[in-house]
A protein has these predicted regions:
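Post-DEXD/H (motif II) to motif III coupling segment of the RecA-like Helicase ATP-binding lobe
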Residues: 116-117, 124-166
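Structural beta-sheet core signal
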Residues: 55-56, 83, 146
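Inter-Walker segment of RecA-like/P-loop motor cores
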Residues: 71-109
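Conserved nucleotide-binding/hydrolysis micro-motifs of P-loop NTPases
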Residues: 60-62, 89, 103-105, 124-125, ...
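The Walker A (P-loop) glycine that initiates the GxxxxGKT/S ATP-binding motif of P-loop NTPases
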Residues: 28, 122
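Hydrophobic positions in the central parallel beta-sheet of the AAA+
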Residues: 26, 55, 97-99, 110, ...
Length: 166
């Protein structure tokens, strides 16, 4: 990957867990490099499979942050990544889509069929009906990962997340 820095052991362990399990909730504290974990997993999967990758984040600022993080890691984001949020084009042939959930939850199920991998950043927010609807439309996504720095501790919430991400 030619990263500009060394990946930490716990990040490497999270990536290995993701590859082995295919579905996982990756719990890691704020500031621990969750975007790097997403990036390394994404790069592995995009090079190993033909299906595209969807990265869902809660806000437009996080769309930009994730995009810029990938750029910082040395990725050609202009060539491979597309951002979707208010005012951005919803159609693209780029293989990696970074979007807010609000921008895509009303899309038809066939729009989601191209994705073999889905990342839900800040997945503790995925208990909402809109986010659950998105995940249920991603029927082709063999790989599903949720990342979060916190789980709220409610058993019902944890079971919903396990159902969506593994």
């Amino acid at each position: 990957l030619k990263l500009p820095f060394k990946i930490r052991d716990y990040q490497f362990d999270a990536v290995c867990t993701g590859i082995q399990r295919k579905n996982a909730i990756l719990l890691s504290p704020t500031g621990s490099g969750k975007s790097l974990i997403i990036y390394v997993l994404m790069r592995y999967l995009i090079s190993s499979f033909e299906q595209d990758v969807l990265v869902i984040v809660p806000t437009t600022s996080l769309v930009e942050q994730m995009y810029n993080d990938f750029k910082t890691y040395g990725y050609d984001v202009e060539k491979y990544c597309h951002r979707i949020y208010s005012g951005k084009d919803k159609n693209t042939t780029k293989r990696i889509i970074i979007s807010t959930w609000q921008s895509i939850y009303r899309f038809q199920p066939d729009w989601f069929s191209r994705f073999g991998t889905v990342f839900g950043d800040e997945c503790h927010g995925f208990k909402s009906k809109s986010l659950t609807t998105i995940m249920n439309k991603c029927v082709e996504a063999e790989y599903r990962f949720g990342t979060t720095g916190t789980l709220d501790g409610a058993l019902t919430h944890e079971l919903v997340l396990q159902g969506l991400f593994g």
